Regions:
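Sec-dependent signal peptide recognition
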Residues: 2-10
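SAM/dcSAM-binding transferase cores
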Residues: 9, 19-36, 172, 190, ...
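Class I SAM-dependent transferase core
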Residues: 19-110, 121, 126, 141, ...
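Conserved nucleotide-cofactor-binding alpha/beta core module
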Residues: 102-211
Length: 213
């Protein structure tokens, strides 16, 4: 399915949601405020975020990627628990890591650490295909169903050890490692296209980009 059809499916899902009395318009307003907060927080960086990244975050309904008890807080610029000892990342970090990848519309992206699927949805708004791996089986199952329900047909979810990558789908234009790692797993580097970009997250790797030779 073309990503052009995603907004129509999202609109239907949003219209059907009424969390603790909040309306679609109220969620939209909260999301706009969140994007403004992200913009303000990145003011100290060398350059502004790509407008496409901010537009993608403005389109993805974060409240549908967290448990019902967390939905009133979905548009606060902070991580939230999603169960199984995991969290959904702070929106600013989602924007930063996405921006660092310098994505193109035809890119194929591998994400390590699906979580609730929120980061994958943001990536799907920007690229041709997203392949995402989650080691916690219940989270992978929930994320797959959620992304399908919201119309993200250009996302494929796999249950497994993300540090081994996804050789059958390689090579990738970009790889995002959202699960913390002390060093970049070698299989991931091998699965990058020449000139590909990787944003790892972990000790010594925050806010950095690795490039394939």
């Amino acid at each position: 399915m073309s990503t052009m059809k995603i907004p129509l499916l999202l609109a239907a899902a949003l219209a059907a949601s009424d969390v603790l009395g909040a309306t679609k318009a109220e969620f939209d307003a909260r999301r706009s405020t969140m994007v403004e907060e992200i913009t303000a927080e990145q003011a100290g960086l060398p350059g502004p975020f790509d407008p496409r990244v901010k537009d993608a975050i403005a389109r993805v309904p974060r409240h549908l990627f967290v448990p019902p008890a967390q939905q009133p807080y979905a548009y606060e610029n902070r991580p939230l628990p999603i169960g199984h000892g995991q969290t959904i990342s702070q929106p600013y970090i989602v924007a930063l890591m996405t921006d660092l990848l310098k994505l193109g519309k035809q890119d194929r992206v591998l994400e390590i650490g699906t979580g609730s699927g929120y980061q994958a949805a943001v990536l799907a708004e920007l690229v041709r295909s997203v392949y995402t791996i989650e080691i916690v089986a219940p989270l992978a199952t929930e994320a797959r169903a959620r992304l399908e329900r919201l119309g993200y047909r250009n996302v494929e979810v796999r249950t497994g050890d993300g540090y081994k990558g996804w050789e059958e789908r390689a090579p990738f234009d970009a790889i995002m490692v959202t699960a913390g790692a002390d060093e970049v797993p070698r299989p991931l580097i091998r699965q990058l296209k020449p000139g590909g970009r990787m944003v790892p997250r972990g000790a010594g790797w925050e806010h950095s980009v690795a490039h394939a030779d």
